[in-house]
Structures are given as structure tokens and as C-alpha cells.
A protein has these predicted regions:
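Extracytoplasmic gate region of multi-pass secondary transporters
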Residues: 58-59, 244-285, 289-292
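Helix-breaking motifs and short loop linkers at transmembrane-helix boundaries and internal kinks
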Residues: 70, 102, 123-129, 306, ...
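Helix-to-loop junctions at the C-terminal end of transmembrane segments
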Residues: 90-102, 294-306, 391-392
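Structural signature of the two symmetry-related core transmembrane helices
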Residues: 105-119, 309-323, 404
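Paired small-residue
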Residues: 117, 128-136, 332-340
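Cytoplasmic helix-loop-helix junction between adjacent transmembrane helices
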Residues: 133-172
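Helix-loop-helix hairpin linking two adjacent transmembrane segments in secondary transporters
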Residues: 162, 166-219
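A late C-terminal transmembrane helix in Major Facilitator Superfamily
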Residues: 359-396
């Protein structure tokens, strides 16, 4: 008698790997997105050093330094011009440097250089020495800002769903530097000869703290996010010369002239209008906070607009913000101006990186970002001296009017820029 045959239904059935539950997949995606946000925020402390601490803090230091050292507005603007000239040299050198060293290495070198030079400004009173130090600080700032932009673009391409947000988070990090400056500078100024010097030391210490986080984030991005592979149509895009995006470059250059006039002299204008130090510090804090939150505000625009339209919109809004305190001398107008300006000006910078990411292949990003940074630096060189000269002869309000007109002209140029290739 044969033993009863065992059922083989379970064994004969085809076997499949169990699919992960939908909730698990969603949680993994959420964790990946949050990790990308954290990296972008960490990296953004590099932009906090490059612009917020190393450059825009000077607007708060300008009034006490001008009074203590007997400068004219043109002389005071010359220090920002020297800083912008250094920024230009750094931007021009970046494509060559990036072929020899990784972006993370260049960012770290820029952080060290900038922190040391910020401290050096605290022991210097001679105009010539300060000019040299501010020029060298600009070189360090460019290394930080451009290499950080390359890494942010790489992170954005690895997370296309949040690409605009990630770029905005990186550039919006400048707001952290503005907020830190607006708190540190008034707290460390002392009422004596050269009483502005301790503020430079405080800013240098803030640079060191921010650098530790930014360099760590840069290393993780380089380790986890390699440059994406080139696409089929990348060969044609790689051959595109800067002449093909000349309108965007021109609009961005005029942005550099117009925005730096505002950021250099707005604090002096408010103080000349009789506003207290507390009001001015609160204004600068609000400007910085608006810069930080701007990442979310404009992320959709940066994702949708592949040509120069985003830069055009932002330049026009910046022109309006710049006109407000020149035409209406009231704290309320100043605060509205600061919030609008803060919410838009670093997104204008982010829009150029978004343009490069949309229109050039990954191996062309360093060259593209460097081209925008270079024209931006030319604008920043001209801006402080030109607006300072106008302000010396016709008043600070007239200088801001000229800044606004420059921004409107930049909006018109950027609006003429078309995308270099169609969306994939």
C-alpha cells in the first residue's frame, strides 16, 4: 500500500521576493529626502561664511569704521570693491583649480583662508592693509561659494523632486550669516578708538564654527553623490559658449551692481535717517530671516523656469525693494523693504545655478557656475564705488535709486534669455 501523496502545491508554486510594504518604501523615500535637506542645510553654512559673515557684515561695520577712520562713502565702498575684486579672481581661478582638486577640498581651503583673514581685519587700521585683506577674503569667499554651488547642484540632481528647494536651502544659508552678524556686531562694538575691532574677531570665530559643519557636509556629498552620467544631448549643450546665455549673464551682472549697492549702504541710510541702533539691528535680523525662508518660497519657480525668467522676476522685485527706503523714510517701509529684499536676493543667485543645471551637462557645471560668478563679481566691483560716488555727491537715497534702476535693467535683460535645450 502506497503512502498517501503529500500535497506539493506550496512547493510547486512560483516563489517571488516579498515586495516591501508601501509604507516602508514611503518611509525610505522620506528618510532620503530629509537626509538631502540636512546636507543642503549643513552645506549652506559655507554660503553663510562667504557672503553673510565675510561680506554683508561689513554693512554693520561701515558706520563705526567710517566715523573712526574719517572715510568718505567712496572710501568705505572701496573696501567692498576690493572684496569683490578678490571674489572675481577666485571665480576666474576656480575652473582651473577644480581640475586639480575636488570641490570639497576647495571649499575647506576657502573656509580656512576666510576665517584667518577676518581675524586679521581686527588688528588692522591702515586703509591699504585693509584693502589687501578684503581682497584676499574675497578670494576665499569665491572658493567657498562656487565649490558649494557645484556640490549643491550635484545634490539637487540626485534629488530632482526637491531640486529647487535644495538649491534654495544652500544659497539661503547666507541668511544665517546675516542674522549672526546682526547679533554679533552690535554686541561686540565698544565705545573707544577702533572700537569696531572686537567685532571682526567675533565674526572670525563664527566662521570657524560654520566651517566645521559645512566642510563635513561637503565631504558627505562628495562621498554619497557622484556626478550624474551625461545624457545623449549633452555633447551639443557642452559646446554652448557663454554667448548663448549672454542675456542671463548680463542680467546677473547688473544684479551684482544693484544689489551690492543696497547691501553696502542701507544701514548707513537708515542711521542717517535717525533710526536707532536697535531698529537697524532688528531690520538686519529680519532681512536675514527672510533670506533663510526664501528657499521654500521660490523653489517651484526655479524648477519650472529653464531660461532667464526666474532671474527677471527676482531682479524686478529687488528693484522695488531697493526703491522703498529711498522714497519713504519710515521704519515700516524699511522693514517691508528688508523682508522683500531678503526673500529674493539669494534666490536670484540660486536661479543661475538652476539655469546651469537645466541647460548644461554635469561636467560643464563648474565652468557655467564660474561664468555667472565672474560676471557677478564684475558687477560687485563697480557697484560699491559707483553708488558710493553718487551718495557722496547727491545723498544715499539717490544712490539707492540708481541701484534700483540697475536692477530693473537687469530684469529686462534676463527676461530675454531662452532655455538652451528642451526639458527631458
Amino acid at each position: 500500500m502506497k503512502p498517501p501523496r503529500r500535497s506539493t502545491a506550496r512547493n510547486d508554486a512560483p516563489t517571488h521576493a516579498a515586495a516591501p510594504p508601501p509604507d516602508a518604501s514611503a518611509h525610505a523615500t522620506d528618510r532620503s529626502r530629509i537626509a538631502a535637506w540636512r546636507l543642503a542645510i549643513g552645506l549652506s553654512l559655507g554660503s553663510a561664511i562667504a557672503l553673510g559673515l565675510a561680506r554683508f557684515s561689513y554693512a554693520l561695520l561701515l558706520p563705526p569704521m567710517k566715523a573712526d577712520l574719517g572715510w568718505s562713502f567712496a572710501q568705505a565702498g572701496a573696501l567692498n570693491t576690493a572684496n569683490a575684486a578678490g571674489y572675481l579672481f577666485g571665480a576666474l581661478a576656480f575652473p582651473w583649480l577644480s581640475r586639480r582638486w575636488r570641490a570639497g577640498t576647495l571649499l575647506a581651503a576657502g573656509c580656512v583662508l576666510t576665517a584667518c583673514l577676518m581675524a586679521a581685519c581686527g588688528v588692522t587700521v591702515g586703509m591699504q592693509a585693509l584693502l589687501v585683506q578684503r581682497l584676499a577674503t574675497g578670494i576665499g569667499s569665491a572658493l567657498i561659494f562656487v565649490s558649494g554651488g557645484v556640490l549643491a547642484a550635484r545634490l539637487a540632481s540626485a534629488s530632482p523632486r526637491d531640486a529647487g528647494l535644495l538649491l534654495g536651502l544652500y544659497y539661503g544659508g547666507t541668511g544665517w550669516g546675516i542674522v549672526a552678524s546682526s547679533l554679533l556686531v552690535p554686541a561686540t562694538l565698544v565705545h573707544r578708538a577702533h572700537g569696531w575691532q572686537p567685532a571682526w574677531f567675533a565674526l572670525a570665530l563664527a566662521c570657524v564654527l560654520c566651517a566645521a559643519i559645512a566642510v563635513s557636509a561637503a565631504r558627505r556629498i562628495e562621498h554619497n553623490h557622484r556626478p550624474p552620467p551625461a545624457r545623449v544631448d549633452d555633447a551639443a549643450a557642452a559646446r554652448a559658449s557663454p554667448a548663448r546665455f549672454a542675456f542671463a549673464l548680463g542680467g546677473y551682472g547688473l544684479f551684482g551692481v544693484g544689489y551690492i549697492g543696497y547691501m553696502t549702504f542701507i544701514v548707513a541710510l537708515l542711521r542717517d535717517a535717525g533710526m536707532s541702533g536697535t531698529v537697524v539691528s532688528a531690520f538686519y535680523v529680519m532681512l536675514g530671516v527672510a533670506t533663510i525662508v526664501s528657499a521654500r518660497l521660490w523653489s517651484g519657480l526655479l524648477d519650472r523656469m529653464r531660461g532667464g525668467q526666474a532671474l527677471a522676476v527676482l531682479n524686478a522685485l529687488l528693484g522695488i525693494a531697493t526703491l522703498m527706503p529711498a522714497l519713504i523714510v519710515h521704519p515700516a517701509a524699511a522693514f517691508v523693504s528688508g523682508v522683500l529684499f531678503g526673500a529674493t536676493f539669494l534666490s536670484a543667485v540660486a536661479s543661475t545655478t538652476a539655469f546651469v543645471r537645466h541647460n548644461l551637462p554635469p561636467d560643464g557645471w563648474p565652468k557655467g557656475i564660474s561664468a555667472f560668478t565672474t560676471i557677478f563679481a564684475f558687477g560687485q566691483i563697480a557697484g560699491p564705488v559707483a553708488i558710493g560716488w553718487v551718495s557722496d555727491s547727491a545723498g544715499l537715497a539717490r544712490g539707492l535709486v540708481y541701484s534700483a534702476l540697475t536692477l530693473f535693467a537687469g530684469a529686462a535683460l534676463a527676461a530675454a534669455q531662452r532655455a538652451l535645450r528642451r526639458a527631458a
